Amino acid sequence: MKILIAVIPLLAGFLLDCLLGDPYSLPHPIRLIGRFISILEKWVRCRFSSRLVLGGVVMSITVLLTSSLIPLGLLMLCYKLNVWLGVVLESVLCYYMLAARCLRNESMKVYKAIVENDTEKARKAVSMIVGRDTKPLDRNGIIRAAVETVAENTSDGVTAPMLFMGLGGAPLGFFYKAANTMDSMIGYTSEKYLHIGRFAAKLDDVLNYIPSRLTALLMILSAGILNFDIKNAWKIWRRDRRKHASPNSAQTEAVCAGALRVRLAGDAWYFGELHRKPFIGDDIREIENEDIRRANRLMYCTSVLMLALCTGLRAILWGCIL
């Protein structure tokens, strides 16, 4: 029974995410973490103006401890009061940390706009899920950006937090999401964030090292399950998985490019500045709007495989503890 109680929150959290997606109208813990980071950033820039690297370390540790210890305390209290109250709360917390449905919904807005031949609407939709400047993107560039985002965020938004929750429940999942949120907000190499965001960026690279590679391998397996090109997925992953400034981002992008037999990445504009980037994959065929749907299928299949793996891992860990 105790092993069952340990695995229910992760399973229930994923099911809730698949059914409901992000509750945009309700307070979201990750958005609260984002606001906390913004407040701390202003304080750090004021108090550590001449030592921003140190300030970034202080900020990161503060965010990580706060984001993980608060849910840990709440869960300890609820489990002490009633075990099923704890299970319900942890299930909800796990649900908040997964973004599969949100990723699908937002990318499908791009797909629908492309189908309607409304390039401006598609450009606006894709701007909500990518960090690059979208104004220079043509139709194929918009599709490519959406596919890349689904591929990359399969790890960041779904399987990586799932793996951390499998290891340490919701509190460890919040630890990961806090680090990932900091990286997305301050982990840039621009002059503004180079020093204050250095620690957050490096920490995110470390935390994602294993999850991104494990996700890539599961995505290759998913390519075979979905009758995509599994051989090319393996080939392109082996060849192009390091073609990114981040040691982790190209892992799943390379698999997706190979599985779909398209070319992703390449030069992109950020904050009005052109960044030269290598291509990932081969343009065996021209990218098309249906590739957004295919990328989502890859994302969901990979997520289910990771869920099965993490559920087994959590059961084994609790079996050893008990």
Report the location of each language-model feature.
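Hydrophobic alpha-helical transmembrane segments
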Residues: 1-175, 179, 187-322
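Glycine-rich phosphate/dinucleotide-binding loop and adjoining beta-alpha-beta core of small-molecule
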Residues: 184
